[in-house]
Amino acid sequence: MTNCQNTSRDPQGKMVDIDGILYQIIDGKLYRYADLTLDKGFKIVLGRPGSEEILKNLLNRLLGVGIVHLEYRSSEYPGMTEEDRTSRFDIYCRDKNGSSFIIEMQNWSQKYFNKRAVYYSSLAVQNQAVEEYRRQKEELKRDWDYDFQPLYVVSFLNFRNWTLDGCERRSNEYVATYRYCDVETGNELNDGTNLVFIDLDRFDKTIDACDSLEDMWLYSIKNMSKQSFCPNTVEGTEVEELFRQAELAKMTEEQRISFEISVMSRNDMLNSFRETLEAAKEEVKAKVLAEGRAEGRAEGLAEGRAEGINSVIKQMHTKGMSIQQIADIVEMPVDEIQAIVQL
């Protein structure tokens, strides 16, 4: 991703050739590959026909399952209210054994993201129930007996997975799988429900530090849009195909425009936060100076400014920004941002 002059902000989906490589210009930056941390980029790259093999390899590697074949299914479900007519997953698919996989990219923090995953799992069970009931009715068999196939709700989190905070060191720092179990013995219910949270925010390895295919998958998903080439260490591995599929030049104009709108919307939100932060700084400065106190004025100004910044940082986090995103905007260390949001 490189800076480039952008004369129009109307989404056009057009490509430019630079040294034999096609890039898309969005808000003055060059993108060779889609940003997979955005819902739209994630769905276009991993949720369209032709991506089944890539998605299969990704899930097998991160979940430790043995998927042989995947089939995309409709990602729409009836909504809870008249205003919200449908719930839409990023990706919904089944394997040949009937196991269901709901895959979501969550770019903004949500207070109840864990409960949202539970809700999505219930929709997958409901879908299996309806299909099985209809099948057995056609075959003149008895009603469905609640024996649903395994289901996985896989959430890629571009914010901190707070469910892991304070936990003992895990063998896998980035992928957490939850199942129903007895609270005293830990024995699993074995109903087939799997809630998987993949913490991209916690993953901070460089490409040179990636020493496994799992690391390469996580690195590539998190940093795809920043690349101009497929890294040497990724070439020849199962992850290389992800780079080929994510090339914007290989997408339709409609897909590129959709992705461009998504990037612009995110940039607008981030710019709004930056403006709010600057306004808070000026407001605090004016308030302290207006008090006209000769003694302790400098100290009061510093304290007031810090208080104002802390307030804005908390607002940014409440509205769904990750710790890393906030740190990038306010130009402060990640650990300091973490401490402020926990105050």
Segments and roles (model prediction):
Residues T2-Y31, F101-Q106, D208, D215, ...:
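Short, charged alpha-helical interaction segments and adjacent helix-coil junctions
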Residues D39, E52-K56, F148-L151, D211-L218, ...:
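Non-catalytic, well-ordered alpha-helical scaffold segments
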Residues M1-N194, D204:
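Accessory alpha/beta interaction modules
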Residues C167, S171, C210-D211, K222:
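Intrinsically disordered, low-complexity regions enriched in Ser/Pro/Gly/Gln/His and often acidic
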Residues D182-L200, S212-M224:
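Low-complexity, glycine/alanine/valine/leucine- and proline-rich hydrophobic stretches
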